[in-house]
């Protein structure tokens, strides 16, 4: 099981308003490949914080089509959505301040470490600042 970050869905689903640079096109294709594998049954996890992050971004740019993605993430048997409580948030805030990462990324990190998960699909280099986690980009 790997965790999956909101950045994967952003790159996979959002349509750019301008032409993409070659590096951006490559990242978009890799993100689509990750999403395809998840759709085909690869087991992944995320916290409710990442789910809300995905929802906010996709709803803003995709409108009602975003609900299909959200429904899949909530109901697919191969996607584990982990709860977040006050204790997770408090620990994550400490991590975020110490490592200079966003709170949502720190929440994912705290839950991952508690669950024994060591890899995350992500295009966010902030995960490289977090010990014991390997960022996977394809």
Predicted segments, located by residue:
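Histidine- and aromatic-rich ligand-binding microenvironments
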Residues: 2-5, 46-48, 101-102, 124, ...
């Amino acid at each position: 099981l790997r965790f999956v970050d909101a950045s994967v869905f952003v790159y996979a689903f959002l349509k750019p308003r301008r032409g993409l640079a070659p590096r951006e096109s490559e990242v978009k294709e890799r993100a689509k490949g990750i999403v395809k594998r998840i759709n085909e049954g690869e087991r992944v996890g995320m916290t409710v914080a990442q789910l809300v992050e995905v929802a906010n971004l996709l709803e803003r740019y995709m409108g009602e089509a975003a609900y299909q993605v959200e429904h899949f993430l909530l109901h697919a048997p191969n996607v584990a959505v982990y709860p977040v409580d006050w204790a997770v948030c408090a620990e994550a805030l400490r991590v975020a301040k110490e490592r200079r990462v966003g709170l949502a990324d720190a929440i994912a990190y705290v839950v991952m470490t508690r669950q024994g998960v060591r890899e995350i699909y992500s295009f966010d280099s902030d995960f490289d600042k977090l010990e014991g986690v390997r960022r996977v980009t394809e």
